[in-house]
């Protein structure tokens, strides 16, 4: 009997119950599943249909007591009871038939004693449960953000139709990974990491703990990416709710503290933070990961093969491509169209090929925004794209940049 501990952190998500149902219904051996759920809920949500199911271990948290994604995931890990395997998810997924057998077989195919298989999952639309793609994704590093994290993009794995086993990876995603159960004990989630940075932390820390990273060679799980129809943590943890004493701290302070910890762990800066048990492992070193993945954190370099998505390992320190070596510091003002009744305004800067060079998510309206960033590619246009209070995107407006 191969038991699987399914970890789900859910925040006010109407897709939680449909995700659980599909996970159970599509498993070949649903009797071997156990669920660890951190259920960060409001007053109208219900898990009543699973109340008497002994496969479920649920941490019940009112939404305003939550401290963020990785805090929830750290609590879930403590619910592990020796299951041979573990699958970590978000709370909005769909599954292939017999997904449990497929993932166990993938781990065996790697030939590794400590494999972790994961990536950005495929895409689905909850309306009609439409699965939007078949091709499996790899995670490709695009650039370092100003906060010190890496922005990743999904890319279809080249030649995936002919692949028969998982491929080596330099990154895995927190919203979908499958590994041996003792990862719950060995990789302790840092509860102080808010949201951004979870993936690079998961990747480098697992690697230094001796885990070998892989992407699945076929699509097994789908994910809902648009966030439409659900409240996000940062929607609730705002200044108004702090003033009304509904929450203790705005999300951006949690995020700032989180990124300082992350930069210290990645050795981008030394800020005297004591990471305790949430630092790197000792089986491999920080430098081992840099050479394997083609990344230099302190100088924020990406190897050209890393940027291109070539399968690792790189093992080449003689031909680094410093994205900022030939970079230019850009600073210019943009006039934001008057916007009312919005939840967020996406402001993006793109080059002539449509690559995102810089991004700002506005949660408060300003009529003039000063953009400051570095890039070795010339900005071509900026994008204004607001989201309304019901999580619907307004029309996107692209404006060619002429003042730089």
Please tell me what each predicted stretch does.
Residues 2-281:
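Catalytic cores of eukaryotic secretory-pathway lumenal/extracellular enzymes that build
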């Amino acid at each position: 009997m191969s038991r699987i501990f399914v970890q789900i952190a859910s925040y006010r998500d109407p897709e939680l119950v449909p995700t659980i149902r599909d996970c159970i219904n599509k498993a070949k051996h649903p009797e071997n599943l156990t669920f660890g759920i951190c259920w960060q809920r409001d007053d109208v949500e219900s898990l009543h249909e699973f109340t008497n199911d002994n496969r479920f271990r649920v941490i019940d948290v009112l939404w305003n007591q939550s401290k963020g994604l990785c805090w929830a995931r750290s609590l879930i890990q403590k619910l592990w009871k020796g299951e041979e395997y573990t699958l970590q998810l978000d709370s909005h997924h769909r599954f292939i038939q017999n997904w449990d057998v497929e993932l166990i077989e993938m781990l065996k195919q790697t030939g590794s004693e400590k494999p972790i298989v994961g990536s950005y999952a495929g895409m689905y639309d909850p309306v009609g449960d439409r699965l939007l793609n078949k091709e499996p994704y790899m995670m490709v590093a695009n650039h370092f953000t100003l906060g010190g994290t890496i922005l990743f993009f999904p890319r279809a794995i080249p030649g995936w139709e002919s692949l028969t086993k998982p491929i080596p990876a330099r990154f895995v995603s927190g919203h979908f990974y499958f590994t041996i159960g003792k990862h719950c004990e060995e990789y302790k989630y840092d509860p102080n990491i808010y949201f951004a940075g979870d993936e690079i932390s998961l990747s480098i820390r697992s690697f230094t703990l001796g885990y070998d990273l892989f992407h699945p060679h076929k699509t097994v799980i789908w994910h809902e990416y648009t966030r439409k129809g659900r409240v996000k943590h940062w929607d609730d943890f705002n200044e108004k709710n702090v003033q009304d004493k509904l929450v203790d701290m705005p999300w951006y302070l949690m995020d700032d503290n989180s990124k300082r910890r992350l930069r210290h762990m990645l050795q981008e800066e030394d800020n005297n933070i004591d990471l305790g048990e949430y630092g790197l492992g000792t089986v491999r070193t920080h430098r081992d990961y840099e050479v394997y993945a083609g990344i230099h954190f302190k100088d924020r370099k990406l190897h050209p093969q890393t940027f291109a998505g070539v399968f690792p390992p790189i093992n080449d320190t003689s031909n680094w491509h410093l994205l900022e070596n030939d970079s230019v510091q850009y600073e210019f003002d943009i006039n934001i169209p008057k916007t009312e009744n919005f939840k967020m305004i996406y402001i993006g800067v793109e080059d002539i090929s449509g690559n995102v060079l810089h991004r700002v998510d506005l949660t408060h309206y300003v009529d003039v925004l000063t953009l400051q960033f570095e890039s070795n590619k010339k900005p071509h246009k900026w994008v204004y794209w607001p989201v309304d209070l019901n999580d619907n995107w307004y029309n996107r407006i692209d404006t060619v940049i002429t003042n730089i």
